[in-house]
Amino acid sequence: MDEIINKYQAVEKLFKEIQEGLAMYDQYKTLINELLHYNNHIKQEYFNFLMIISPYLIRAHSGETLRNKVNNEIKRLILVENINTKISKTLVSVNFLLQKKLSTDGVKTKNMWCTNNPMLQVKTAHNLFKQLCDTQSKTQWVQTLKYKECKYCHTDMVFNTTQFGLQCPNCGCIQELMGTIFDETHFYNHDGQKAKSGIFNPNRHYRFWIEHILGRNSEQELGTKQDPCGTKVLQQLKKIIKRDNKCIALLTVENIRKMLKEINRTDLNNCVSLILRKLTGVGPPQISESILLRGEYIFTEAIKIREKVCKKGRINRNYYPYYIYKIFDAILPPNDTTNRRILQYIHLQGNDTLANNDSEWESICMELPEIKWKPTDRTHCVHFF
C-alpha cells in the first residue's frame, strides 16, 4: 500500500514541477491545459483509492491477527482495482504529449511505448520536461511580435480587406501586411459549394472503433426504449444458437453478424465484440495503452496519406476497421498470441472490396515507414481461437 501511495505522490510532484516550470512560457499554455486534465484525473483516482482502503486502515488497529488479514485484503484490492495500470495509463498519455511537443519543436526523443513501470515513466516524463526547458532556454533570444496590437492605443486591430491590412477600431490606424494576399472569395462560399461543418479528425474515428472492437462501449447501445438493457436481443441470439446447435465457445464475429441480420438488428453490427463477451463470457484482449497510442499515431498518419494517394475514381467510403486490422497485424509480434486475438474481432469486407483496400493500402505503406505491406489473409485469425 505504501508503494502505491509513493507512486501517487511522485506523480503529483511531477505534475507540480512541470506546471511551475512551463507556466512562464506562453507557447506551452495549451500543453499545460492538456496536462491539467490528467492531473485532475490522477487526483481523483488517488482519492478513490484512499476511500477504498480507509475502512481497512481503521480495522488494522484492532490487533495483529486482524492486521495481517486486513493487509492481505488491501493487497487483493490493489490487484482487483488494477491501481498500477491506472497510474501507468495516465503517465503513458503524459509522456506522449511531452514527446509530441518536443517533436514539433524539432527535438528527437526516444519512444517509450512499451514501458509499464510507473516510477520509470515518472523519470521519463521528468527527463522530457527537462528537454523542453533546455530547448526553451536555447531560444530565449527569440521574441514574439504582437502584430495585431495597435502601437498607439494597444488594442487589438481587425482585418480590413479593402485597405489590405489591419485597422485599429479605436484610432483608425492602419498597418499594412506585407506579402499577404486578400481575396474576398475566401470569405464566402462559391455557388454550388457547401461549407464544411467542421475539421476532419481521424483520432475520433480511431477511438470510436477501438472502443467497439475491444467491447468497451456502453451496454446501453444494445438496448431500446422498450428493452433498455438489450436483454431481448441476447435472448433471441441464444435461441438461434440453441436451434442451430452452435458451440458458444467457437462463435465468431461473422456468426454474430449473420444472426443479427436474421433478427433484423444489423444496427448492432458495431457492437459485435460486446455481444460476444455477453454470450461467451470471454472478451477481446485488453491491449495496453502504449500499444493503442502507437496504433492511433500510425492510423492518423495512414489516413492523411490516404487522402493524398487515394484513387479519384473510387467512391467507397473509408472502412476504418480495415486500417486498424492492418496496423495491429503489423505492429503486434507473431508470437504475441494474446494481443493478436484482437484480429478475430474485426470484420473484413467482401473479397472484391478487400482486394481494392489491399491495393490502396500498398500505396499508403510506400509513404508509411512504420508498416511493411503484405496482403490480407482471411484465415490468419483462425490460429488465435
Curated annotation (Swiss-Prot):
GO terms for biological process: regulation of viral transcription. Induction: Expressed in the late phase of the viral replicative cycle. Keywords: Late protein, Metal-binding, Zinc, Zinc-finger. It comes from the Viruses. It holds the Pfam family Pox_VLTF3. A zinc finger (C2H2-type) spans 166-190, 168-190. One of its GO terms (molecular function) is zinc ion binding. Transmembrane segments: none annotated. Belongs to the asfivirus B385R family. This is Zinc finger protein B385R. It comes from African swine fever virus (isolate Tick/South Africa/Pretoriuskop Pr4/1996) (ASFV).
